[in-house]
Every structure is written in structure tokens, then in C-alpha cells.
């Protein structure tokens, strides 16, 4: 699975931490989430998006990364940091938790 990252400070912070192995927890049967430690930098980053399947976001109030596998409504608390390319999101569209490794190509 590949992803195209946004051109913002939060996405750059995420990429700077790669490789990164995490457990993605299913949340609301809509997204997979994890909590980076420390939280990703969101200072000066534009907030607000209506996530589509494949969007990689940060939920600002909690600091978690959320990868949406279903469409969701507009939220001013979401920050878009990237999108999974093509139909790669299908691999995450399963119930339960998954352990994944994020790497640079």
C-alpha cells in the first residue's frame, strides 16, 4: 500500500518518524486510529476536512492519527496529512485491530 502525503508540517513530522510500527485500533467502524508519542506537530496547519476513504488525518483534540475507510462528515478538528493511493484502503477495511508498519519508499 502506498500513500501520498500532504505538504504540511504535520505530514512532514509523520514522515520524519518512519519507519513506524503501530497497532491500528478500529474506531466507530469507520476508521483505524493510533496515538503517536509524542503527538504530531499541528502548529500552523490548516484544520478542517470531510474525510473520504483512504484519507490519513489527525484528530486535533486527541492527537490521534485516523485513517478513514468509510466516508465521514466535515469536521473542523480533522487535519488532512495524506491519502492512501488507489484501492489500498481495502486492506484496512476489516473489522478489528491491525498491526502495520509505515515506511518510506
Predicted feature locations:
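A residue-level signal for beta-strand positions that form part of recognition/binding surfaces
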Residues: 21, 64, 97-99
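Well-ordered alpha/beta subsegment
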Residues: 81-105
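N-terminal secretory signal peptides
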Residues: 1-33
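Short, charge-rich binding segments
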Residues: 58-59, 91
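Beta-strand-rich cores of mature extracytoplasmic or soluble domains
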Residues: 60-84
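Loop/turn positions that initiate beta-strands
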Residues: 53-55
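Solvent-exposed coil/turn segments that connect beta secondary-structure elements
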Residues: 6-8, 19, 62, 70-72, ...
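Compact, glycine-rich, soluble single-domain proteins
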Residues: 28-50
Amino acid at each position: 500500500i502506498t500513500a501520498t502525503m500532504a505538504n504540511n508540517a504535520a505530514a512532514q513530522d509523520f514522515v520524519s518518524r518512519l519507519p513506524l510500527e503501530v497497532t491500528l485500533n478500529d474506531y466507530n467502524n469507520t476508521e483505524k486510529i493510533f496515538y503517536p508519542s509524542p503527538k504530531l506537530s499541528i502548529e500552523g496547519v490548516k484544520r478542517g476536512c470531510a474525510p473520504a476513504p483512504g484519507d490519513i488525518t489527525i484528530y486535533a483534540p486527541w492527537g490521534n492519527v485516523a485513517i478513514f475507510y468509510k466516508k465521514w462528515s466535515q469536521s473542523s478538528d480533522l487535519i488532512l496529512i495524506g491519502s492512501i493511493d488507489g484501492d489500498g484502503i481495502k486492506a484496512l477495511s476489516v473489522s478489528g485491530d491491525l498491526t502495520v508498519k509505515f515506511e518510506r519508499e
